[in-house]
Amino acid sequence: MGNNKRDIALPIIISFVLLVVLFVAQFLIPSIQLFGNNKQSTFQQVFELVKNKYVDPVNLDSLESSAVDELLKELDPHSTYLKPADLAEATELLKGHFEGIGVEFSLFNDTATITYVIPEGPSEKAGIRPGDQLIKANGILMVRKNNSTDTIRSIIKGERNSIVNLTILRDQQTLQINVKRDRIPLPAIESSYLLDSKTGYIRLARFSETSYEEFMKAVETLKSQGAQQLMLDLRGNGGGLLSEAIDIADEFLDQDKLIVYTEGNKIARQEYRARRPGQFEKGKVFLLIDEFSASASEVLAGAIQDWCRGKIVGQTSFGKGLVQEEYSLSNGSALRLTVARYYTPLGRCIQIPYHNNKDTTKKLRYFLNSCKDTLWEENGITPNIKIATTNDTALISSANLMHALTRINQFSFRYYQDNISFFNKKDTPLSLLRDTELSHAIWANWIFAEKSSKNTSTPYSFIEKKFLTERILATLARYKWRNNGYYQVLNANDSTVNKALK
């Protein structure tokens, strides 16, 4: 029986993949005949027969998209087909800006509530305030069951200079406000401040077109404030533009030092070296990484580690050592195809095996840098200073805490709004952390809110209480001091940050 099913499925799968080859080839190189003549290929004939003769209506676009996805799965985990809508969103992240109304919001009981209005942005100019609830946009109802932030975002975003009419609820009154959309920056650096009198801290979320420029401004500011050493936090940074990682690495390394090289079956070796005197070639450097630090983050970390320029601290990185190039397709989509591997200055490819093709008999190579560190290939970037996976990971995996985390934003925003005069008197983010009376009051209010809404029946452990209280305090700090406040509170008791400084 099992063999019969396989026999039936196999021709379908083969046909599916063959169709993909045709479609991708047509999109990428439409002017080239696949077989050197003008006759229709077998693939084209099959496509036309399906299109014109198949028993049921066929959504050819959907079939094509699914077929491409199946083909790419056979290659590697990082070759990707992006539909037009997905491409637009991915491009925004790499561009470092998007077009919208300039607000942050959270969903509270299926209603989008404005939690922050960008200064001098389109919404502030129009009179939108924190606490306003979004009811409609251009007549489209935005209060609905099972609402999502993606749905709300897609409604209020739009082309620059276009107008969106918002219906908002403020103090039980309904208001109509027109907002003229504009370009909104999407910073790559989430936070930069002095950890102590001599240590500058920069948290880089992604490598976008603005990352290097933002990095240089942050370094200049920190040095002017007295920073003599630098902590660059790449935790959770999944990568982005290789060129930005190379430019940032250049600021740490002497001129002409190799930063990274790429090479592929169809791509000749291409070396990237430091080209100019760097802004931070002297002074201690700490790079923080975790299991979500990938790609361009690993390029930067690998260069720093291979040249003994700084210490890598945290957990072993993701292990993505493949380079993608983007090809625009005729239907408005794009193919991000792996064309090369990248190698650290010592020659390490840190790409972990994929498709369960790990060769257990293969003897992995290791390399020694001038610090006599043993550095392995095909295993991501292993930190010089390893930090055990924090208790946070185990905590967040518990159902009790997972549910609680979804309610922190709503609780914190309301607490902040109800006590705004109190927070206006606070002068630094760390003053919140040192205020034990505030911590007790927050926890008492949290427990009261939880019991009132019957959100949990399981008592919180001491560790869970500490974890939640710190995150509520950090979220409160964000409402007043933005991301710098948030990370100053969280980093105060962060084991990776503190270990790096010891």
Please state what every model-predicted region is.
Residues 1-7:
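Short, Lys/Arg-rich N-terminal segment immediately upstream of the first membrane anchor
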Residues 2, 27-39, 43, 47, ...:
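Cleft-lining beta-strand/loop regions that shape enzyme active-site pockets
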Residues 10-27:
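Hydrophobic membrane-insertion alpha-helices, especially the h-region
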Residues 54-115, 161-191, 490-502:
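Extended, small/polar residue-biased N-terminal targeting/export presequences
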Residues 134-135, 164, 350, 375:
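Generic structural signal for buried aliphatic residues
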Residues 259-261, 311-315, 345, 349-352, ...:
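Acidic/polar loop patches that form or flank catalytic/metal-binding clefts of enzymes
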Residues 296, 319-373:
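Polar, glycine-rich mid-to-C-terminal structural blocks
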Residues 348-502:
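Conserved functional hotspot residues or short segments at active or partner-binding sites
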